[in-house]
């Protein structure tokens, strides 16, 4: 709220640090090998991240791999709030530059983040991403990322569904869950979700 922001701005930085908890350092999940492909590990077994105790790095690594792998056809993602220096956005730009079809459903009416989201939308579009803005009179709070791959003559999916924004800063502050899965039924649900959002079918 505006009263909270006014109070927060009125506290000197050094005093704010004294009043805050010691920052928690997120860990890399024990059952994920940091030296192996995250995509291949998710294909073998679902992975559930619990922020802020688990770090966001496994999801970022998943996106980086998707941006580079030749079998990845597309990345679709919903965005409500991004960090000011967003790693997610830069990876999406890299993916588009590598010829992937990148679709971003951007919510421009995220409270207090409107200007930041407009700036990121322009950068994403300039990088070749397809940016859509949802449906009039509705906000999109969904947090979902769908990676579509072609394996032989079949499509397969890696889907990430979570409760938290794709914001590396707040992922270290708020309690959220993030599921990464290769389940086909969830991937098909994700594909249907994005298709319906593209045509405004709610």
Q: Model regions: which residues?
A:
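N-terminal localization/anchoring segments of enzymes in phospholipid and broader phosphate metabolism
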Residues: 1-202
